[in-house]
């Protein structure tokens, strides 16, 4: 049986503390004293990022800071990149921003310390999401945004839910989807969803569908059944892999 950690235990496990000073305003020397490994002197970038995220959340929660009103990338530029640059941590390339995305996933979906929406992030997936009522728990979703109009047309015929992921599923967008389903009253006490995945017949499409399923589980949807649907025309005569 899994043990549920308290908030204090989760924060300790992640190396997060309630510092009295705004970490964004500290000098490189002050930051190094807090976040350098004792053995090597190298900066623990992941711990820096998680503490910056926690400070942003608590400041917004307590009314000491306005909501982000942007996306994760804008948060990277305003809160994370300047601090890491000051510490000499590499900030160019995809891996640097992925550290931020990974940190949020840990804090939001593993430890459940807060919601993305608590920080005021934009619901960028709202434009490619249409929640049904009668069959709202049946979700027809596409890998690519360009297929959203088709997904919506088909879903509307059955008052189901239509969605386009825009590529690899975003944990932030998935949270907003679940929140929208809850707000619409289509998720029962024991949440269960039927997913109809319109993805490419390739390894990427396979993993996109399954990652989306895993994210829904992480946000409390207990039962998720995935029904893969073949989308790429050149493969239409071939059986879909499950």
Predicted feature residues:
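Nucleic-acid enzyme cleavage-core boundary/entry regions
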Residues: 1-193, 206-242
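Short glycine-rich or small-residue beta-strand-to-loop segments that form or flank ligand, phosphate
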Residues: 195-202
């Amino acid at each position: 049986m899994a043990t549920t950690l308290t908030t204090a235990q989760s924060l300790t496990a992640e190396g997060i503390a309630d510092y009295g000073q705004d970490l964004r305003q500290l000098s490189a020397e002050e930051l190094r004293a807090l976040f350098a490994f004792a053995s090597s002197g190298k900066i623990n970038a992941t711990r820096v990022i998680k503490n910056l995220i926690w400070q942003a959340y608590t400041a917004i929660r307590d009314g000491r800071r306005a909501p982000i009103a942007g996306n994760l990338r804008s948060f990277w530029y305003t809160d994370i990149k300047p601090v890491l640059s000051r510490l000499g941590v590499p900030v160019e390339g995809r891996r640097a921003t992925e550290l931020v995305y990974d940190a949020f996933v840990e804090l939001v979906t593993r430890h459940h310390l807060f919601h993305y929406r608590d920080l005021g992030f934009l619901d960028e997936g709202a434009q490619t999401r249409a929640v049904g009522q009668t069959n709202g728990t049946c979700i027809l979703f596409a890998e690519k945004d360009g297929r959203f109009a088709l997904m919506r047309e088909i879903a509307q015929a059955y008052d189901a839910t239509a969605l386009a992921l825009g590529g690899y599923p975003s944990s932030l967008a998935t949270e907003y989807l679940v929140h929208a389903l809850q707000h619409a009253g289509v998720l029962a006490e024991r949440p269960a969803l039927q997913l109809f995945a319109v993805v490419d017949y390739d390894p990427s499409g396979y993993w996109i569908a399954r990652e989306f399923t895993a994210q829904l589980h992480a946000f409390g949807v207990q039962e998720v059944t995935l029904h893969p649907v073949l989308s790429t025309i050149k493969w239409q005569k071939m059986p879909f892999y499950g």
